[in-house]
């Protein structure tokens, strides 16, 4: 039977626990999360176990990536269920700090990332977001000092931002993107899916179907503008309010206009009722 994970809530406790792991010459993988864990998160843990001998999962709802009008206060917090799931997966250490531990009084430092963070996608609608993400992930990398860190590809722009930050700051952390995990009907798993009404939940998979159809059109040789128009019409006809639906270079997130531009990623964000969903697919 697997040993239950150590739970650290203070920096001294985290350092002691990490010291115990490192004394065994362990390689360490970090899986940063905000809790409300689902099978998508657990797939990251399983990948982490394949990439390192010890796995640390952080559970922290990061206030600096939420704007005042967003859902920080109502974001699902399910600590007991999360801890049980992580124990069942054989996680070695859970880092569960509070806000005062991560951002003590007088905290005044922020990491800002250009390039993919200002690609005109999420940053247009959530200009605060990537500075908050880069700052908290930078702190987690310094606190845990992992060899590898696992992030889901559903938040594709975030993955690119974190990868750039990790490289630019010489963290020594290898950032690995894991495949998006989907429900049987194609909806990308997300902690925010719980906000959907039963009726909206039936409509939500249209987002993925529209992206697949757009990718099909692109592969058939149609222009990016024409292909995206087809997908956008599918999305809005289903009742979504579209924030963006774009074809970008998969590595740089630069706008593209043909398949010859390099590897392509379709990225979308749209609101269904009060719930904002994001997703992406490779072409």
From Swiss-Prot:
It comes from Rhodopseudomonas palustris (strain BisB5). ATP binds at residues 34-41, 152-155, 181, 189-192. GO terms for biological process: pantothenate biosynthetic process. InterPro entries: Pantoate_ligase (IPR003721), Pantoate_ligase_C (IPR042176), Rossmann-like_a/b/a_fold (IPR014729). It catalyses: (R)-pantoate + beta-alanine + ATP = (R)-pantothenate + AMP + diphosphate + H(+). Pathway: Cofactor biosynthesis; (R)-pantothenate biosynthesis; (R)-pantothenate from (R)-pantoate and beta-alanine: step 1/1. (R)-pantoate binds at residues 65, 158. Keywords: ATP-binding, Cytoplasm, Ligase, Nucleotide-binding, Pantothenate biosynthesis. Its EC number is 6.3.2.1. GO terms for molecular function: ATP binding; pantoate-beta-alanine ligase activity. The reaction proceeds by a bi uni uni bi ping pong mechanism. Catalyzes the condensation of pantoate with beta-alanine in an ATP-dependent reaction via a pantoyl-adenylate intermediate. It comes from the Bacteria. Gene3D superfamilies: HUPs, Pantoate-beta-alanine ligase, C-terminal domain. It holds the Pfam family Pantoate_ligase. Belongs to the pantothenate synthetase family. Transmembrane segments: none annotated. Beta-alanine binds at residue 65. The active site is at residue 41. Homodimer. It is found in: Cytoplasm. This is Pantothenate synthetase. The gene is panC. GO terms for cellular component: cytosol. SUPFAM superfamilies: Nucleotidylyl transferase. The keyword Nucleotide-binding applies.
